[in-house]
Amino acid sequence: MKRQLATTFAVAFLAATTPGLAQNSVKDALAKHWKTTGEFTIAVADAMPADSYNFRPNPEEMSFGQLMAHIAMADVGACAVASGLTRPELPPKLAEWAKSSGKAEVSKEAAMPFLKDTFDFCDKAVVAMTPERLDTVEGPPARNMTGFEWLWAYFTHTAHHRGQAEVYLRLKGIKPPDYRF
């Protein structure tokens, strides 16, 4: 009888705690990979010389600097929506870029600190997320997603544009940093 009672309690305990454990492991994985993607993206951004931040493969493409600003702007917004934390203010040079609908050039001097601040903010945002926040639907009607979906969507958005940035580097004859995961 004692063994049956102990088994019943053990099964009940596991059933009650497993979803939380699963959500924590998802959150831990998100935190780990957001940190890595931030470090890798910053390394890619740093590999481009300052005098080539206005380089674009063709006139329709964003310049390298605009691409870095786009990554940071999108990520800071997504991490704020996902976590509920207040997004940091844009530095003046990046606010100017945003007001120009992304048409103004962005220097390495302006882009690098913003990228670093963005990934610091996203690291804090992911760590601050509760299991409930990961499952809460947030955002404008056209982009109603759970906190998890916001983080995952913009993690992949970062990878997409970082891949573009690596092509820009290669077109300039620069070997991109080795892949990190």
Where are these regions (language model features)?
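Bacterial N-terminal signal peptides
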Residues: 8-17
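Sec/Tat signal peptide C-region and signal peptidase I cleavage site
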Residues: 18-23
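Short, contiguous alpha-helical
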Residues: 31-35, 39-42, 52-97, 139-181
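Well-ordered alpha-helical scaffold segments within catalytic/enzyme domains
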Residues: 40, 44-45, 79, 121, ...
